[in-house]
């Protein structure tokens, strides 16, 4: 199968992302309050809402804005802490095992069992 070809069955390989042929759910209208018949009763108390209360309740930080603040190559900010060995040791940037040389050239190797026949 070449690149860009269908995977068969007449369906996209990305149906798991887009939901396939499932119909979109219909929006449910919000319930309306029942009208009151008399206006002779006492008026409900008016609560004073400050501008800061409105902004703090409605202001939210978008996830995209948080992602822009994290440097490239770092998945989460909790991994960014000082290490005794230095910042570029271990799997700090790439999540790959270390490539640090552990033996002197010509010395012991973890692959000796392959080349010496286990002697």
Curated annotation (Swiss-Prot):
Reported consequences of knocking out the gene: Isotropic expansion of endodermal and cortical cells in root, etiolated hypocotyl, and dark-grown influorescent stem, and induce right-handed spiral in epidermal cell files of these organs.
Gene name as annotated: SPR1
PTM characteristics: Ubiquitinated. Upon salt-stress induction, it is subject to proteasome-dependent degradation.
Record's compositionally biased regions (Pro residues): 24-34
InterPro entries reported for this sequence: SPR1/2/3/4/5
Compartments reported by the entry: Cytoplasm, Cytoskeleton, Phragmoplast; Cytoplasm, Cytoskeleton, Spindle
UniProt keyword terms in alphabetical order: Cytoplasm, Cytoskeleton, Microtubule, Ubl conjugation
Any single GO BP term: cellular response to salt stress
Species whose genome carries this gene: Arabidopsis thaliana
Function field: Required for directional control of cell elongation. Stabilizes growing ends of cortical microtubules and influences their dynamic properties. Acts redundantly with SP1Ls in maintaining the cortical microtubules organization essential for anisotropic cell growth. Plays a key role in salt stress-induced microtubules disassembly.
Tissues showing expression: Ubiquitous. High expression was associated with tissues undergoing rapid cell expansion, including the root elongation zone, hypocotyls of dark grown-seedlings, and cotyledons of light-grown seedlings.
Keyword Kinase (UniProt): no
Descriptive protein name: Protein SPIRAL1
Family: Belongs to the SPIRAL1 family.
Annotated region described as Disordered, given as residue ranges: 1-47, 85-105
Cellular component, GO annotation: cortical microtubule, transverse to long axis; cytosol; mitochondrion; phragmoplast; preprophase band; spindle microtubule
Gly residues composition bias: residue spans: 1-11
């Amino acid at each position: 199968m070449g690149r860009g070809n269908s995977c068969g069955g007449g369906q996209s390989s990305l149906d798991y992302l887009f939901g396939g042929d499932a119909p979109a759910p219909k929006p449910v209208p919000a319930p309306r309050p029942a009208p009151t018949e008399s206006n002779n009763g006492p008026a409900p108390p008016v609560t004073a809402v400050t501008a800061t209360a409105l902004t703090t309740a409605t202001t939210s930080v978008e996830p995209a804005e948080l992602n822009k603040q994290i440097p490239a190559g770092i998945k989460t900010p909790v991994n960014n802490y000082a290490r005794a060995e230095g910042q570029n040791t271990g799997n700090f940037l790439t999540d790959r095992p270390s490539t640090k040389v552990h033996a002197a050239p010509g010395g012991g190797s973890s692959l000796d069992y392959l080349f010496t026949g286990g002697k």
